[in-house]
Swiss-Prot record:
Protein name as catalogued: Putative F-box protein At3g22421
One Pfam assignment: F-box
UniProt organism field: Arabidopsis thaliana
InterPro entries assigned to the protein according to its UniProt record, in alphabetical order: F-box-assoc_dom_typ1, F-box-assoc_interact_dom, F-box-like_dom_sf, F-box_dom, Gal_Oxase/kelch_b-propeller, SCF_F-box_component
Signal sequence, renumbered to the chain: none
Amino acid sequence: MTMTTTISHLPTELLDEIISRVPLKSTRAVRLTCKNWDSLFKNRSFMKEEAAAKEGESRMIVLMDKNLFAMSIFFNGIDIDPSAEQRGKLTCLYDDSEQVKISQVFHCEGLLLCVLEDDKCSLVVWNPYWGQTRWIEPRYFSRIQNCYGRYMYVYALGYNNKSRSHKILRFIDGAFDFPFWYEIYDFDSDLWTTLDVTPQWFINFPPRGCYNRGVTLKGNTYWCAIRRKSNTNWFVDLDHIICFDFTSERFGPLMPLPFVRYTSGSLVTLSCVREEKLAVLFCNNATVEVWITTKIETDKISWSKFLTVNMYVDLLEGSFFIDEVKKVAMIFDIPMNRETVYIVGEAGNVKELHLGQPVDVDKHFSPLFVCSYVPSLVQIKQPPGCQRKQESSLEKRRCDDENISRLIAHEETYVVYGRYVPSRKKPR
C-alpha cells in the first residue's frame, strides 16, 4: 500500500522552513491558498522566525525608479565585500496587477504610505505582508513644484497611541509669503480636518526641502526643522528637530540637534533604529557623523554619538539606517547617477555597493528611499460600510473658502523656481 503525505501532514518545523522561503511579494497569494497556510502566516512564532534575518543580512524596502522592491544587504565584516539581493518587486497595489508609479513612500511600523504619480497624487496605505490597501483621495492638490520638480506637500503616517487608530498628516508650507495649510485624515471617521497651526518653524524649506522626509517612531513623526524668521539663512540655521503628536494632533517645541551648525553643502537626515530610537546623519562633504537618541519624547530629546568618519561623499538624499551590533551605518544615495549604498564602519572603513543600473537623473530623477522592514500583523482599518460621515459646515468653509481659495489665488500669481502646472480641485 502506498502512503501519500500531504502538505497538512508535514511537521510544523518543515512548514515553517517552506513558508520562510516565500518571497514577500508572493505572501498574499500563498495565504489565500488555504486556511492552514493563512493560519501559519498569522502565527507569531513564525513571524519572529521570518523577522530574524540570516547572519549578516539586513532586510529593507527600497524605492528605486518609482517602484518598490524588497531587498537584502549582506554584510559580514568590513574586510568582506558586501552584496545585495533583490527579493522581488512589490506589485500588488492594483488587483489587476497593473503597476503604478510611486513618487514618495513613508513607513510606519510595517505599513507604507505611498504617494502615487498620477494626476491626483492619490494616497494609498499598504501592508505588503497582508496585501491590504486603503485608498485615500486628497481634497485638493496644488500643482506648484519646487526646483527639483517635486510637489510641495509634506506627508506623515502615524497613529493615536490610545486607540491605535491610524492618521495621515498632510501640509503645504513654503518659504516666505507662500500660504500654509495643515490637515489630518482620520481612518476612523474617513474625513479630512483642517488643523489650527501657526508654525513658528519651517519643515519644507529650500534648498533641500524636497528631501526632508519625516520619520515615524512609536506613532509620532519627527522632522528636521529651522526656526521661522524673516531673515533666515537657509544654509546655516538647520539645528532643530520637531515632533508631531498624532494623539493630541499637535506639534511639540523645537528641540536641538546634537551637532553645532549646519553649513553650506551639508545634509541632515533622520532614520529609525529598530522602532525604538531615532538616528540623525550629518554630512558636510568631508565628515559623516551619526547620532542616536538616548531619550526621546515629544518635547525632550538627548543624543549620543554613534560614529564619526572622515570621508568625502556628495549626498543628495542620505536615506540611511544603522546596525548597532556591527557598528556600521548604511547610507543610500545616487552619486554619479547610480543607486549606491555606502557601508561606513566606526574605524573609518567604507565599503561601496552599487544597487542598480546607471540612471539619467537629468531626464528621469527618482528619489532613492530605504527603510528597514519587518512584516507587520497590523490590519488596515477599512472605511465604514455605511454612508460616509459628512464634514461640518465649519470645516467645509475652512477648506473651500479659506485654504483652497488662498492656494488658487496664490498659484495664479506665484511661480516657485519657474515650475507650475495648473491645479486640480476635487469635486465637492
